[in-house]
Amino acid sequence: MVAIGLGRVPSAIGQQTRELHVWHTEVEPQTVKTIQDTSIAEFEKKFPGFKVRQQALGWGDLNTKLLASLAAGNPPDLTHLNPFMTASLYTKQLLRPMDELIRALGESDIHEATLKLQYFDGKYYGVTHAMGATYFAERRDLREKKGIKPPETYDDMLKLCAALTEGGRYAFQMPGEKLYMGFVHPAEWLAGNGGSWVDPKTWRPQLNSKAMLEALDYAQKLNKFQPQGWPGQKYLDTLAALANGKIAMAHLSGARTIGYIERYAPEGMRDPEHFMPLLRPHGPSGKVGISALDGENWAVFTQSKYPNEAFEFLRLFYKKEHYLAYCHTVPIHLSPIFKSMLNDPTYLANERIKKWRPWHDVMVTGLKNNRFLPIGFSRPEDNLLPFLAELDGSGIVADMVVEVMVGGKNPKAEADRAQKRAEELLTQLGVKRWS
């Protein structure tokens, strides 16, 4: 079992306290406090010689800090990882397998949407902390007043945007951070338009493929329905703009948006009759729209100082009462990874889940109908690509999107330029398989 060798609890007298470093991406104060009061408190009681130091980091900061700590040889003992980074770290032999933990948690109860995301050569190297769907968040009342159905295609979405842009209000706003508009959204466009980042066999980039060109054309047309200064604004700014009526849809949203609606929307409008999720439309070459599934995985490194204790901490993190409390800190956005818990009356009894139940139902139905792929994935097999983290970090895709959307440049010319740069990058990384 994972607990092998954990009998060596240091004697309290005269022995220095050891620190278990845990990094994660849940920055909301109530979540940080709950982790401290549940898993950490129980862990420190169980292992009196240890102090757990948790550090909450935003997505963008996490990737940068992690890569620096790995290069320096002192990563945290336990961390969240973006799923598109995992294959890259696995091929560099930086991750420890966690099969025993997965079996202890209940392999068959972990949702299929996340179970095998970090599964390489017959072993598990990660476990998702929680699942959160992403989508448009819309002012449902405004769309319904126009008598328009939820859009299914790019054309439907452009017509809806034209109808909702009026009287100083814009139809939507995209977040300006490069990770979102330059990686997360292009992955969704490819996935929902029959495309992929690379050719599945040769790994040759597909940035100037028909699927990407159609998506860039759509993005360029969409741009006129959002406020001009959007590239300088962030994800959270778009949620505030939706809640206070400046826009009719936030392009990137999850159930975390509910907190903004309850804080900033006018009283009498803080409900699912006015605000609802809207799944992504599909392109002319696609059959169904795909949205990103937000769910970082826990990882333990080969360089971790206290790997046994890190796994022991995870057992406590997923202990039912601790995990329920964790998921309830951002209801619906932190949906449990366990199928049994998704329908558990104790989980569903949370006040916010009861009030916003239609948002929970969108998530569950989307999971059932395969409408979600992990962040940055254009197809399920992308979890095996060992260069997605580098492609994101290079800014190649982000530059292309900015030139097309903000600069109004020709999509084909920008896609050709990005394609050339991506081919050079993959060649430099030594992963070129095409001739």
Which residues make up each language-model segment?
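Glycine-centered hinge/linker elements that transmit conformational signals in sensory
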Residues: C161-L164, K201-G232, M276-R280
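Hinge/lid segment of periplasmic solute-binding proteins
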Residues: P83-Y135, K149, L158, G182-H185, ...
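Extracytoplasmic/periplasmic solute-binding protein
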Residues: F120-D121, Y125-H129, T134, L158-P205, ...
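Paired acidic/hydrophobic, glycine-rich loop segments that form the ligand-binding mouth/hinge
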Residues: D77-H80, A248-S253, G259-Y260
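Short amphipathic alpha-helical coupling segments at ligand-binding clamshell hinges
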Residues: I35, S39, A211-Y218, E296, ...
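A structural signal for short loop-to-beta-strand junctions that line the ligand-binding cleft
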Residues: D77, G106-L142, A171, S285-S291, ...
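C-terminal lobe and pocket-closing loops
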Residues: A255-D271, P284-G395, R433-W434
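Conserved N-terminal structural module of periplasmic/extracytoplasmic solute-binding proteins
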Residues: M1-K92, E100-E107, P231, S285, ...
